[in-house]
């Protein structure tokens, strides 16, 4: 399983800019498990059309990934 997004070579700069935040090698194993699925999906999305909606989709996916990671880290009340 890759630890960084690996889409096609020609990415719009805004797509590449967001895609970098899906890397997960720096995370501890229990967070890599959560993040890797989002990285895989982000790579698939980035391999599609290069337009503003792709960037929007990746930003929203990034927001979901961040929430999923925080859910694992949640200490409870």
Regions found by a protein language model. Give the residues of each.
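Intrinsically disordered, low-complexity regulatory regions
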Residues: 1-49, 64, 73-77
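Short, charged, amphipathic alpha-helical segments
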Residues: 55-62
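Charged, amphipathic alpha-helical regulatory modules used
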Residues: 69-70
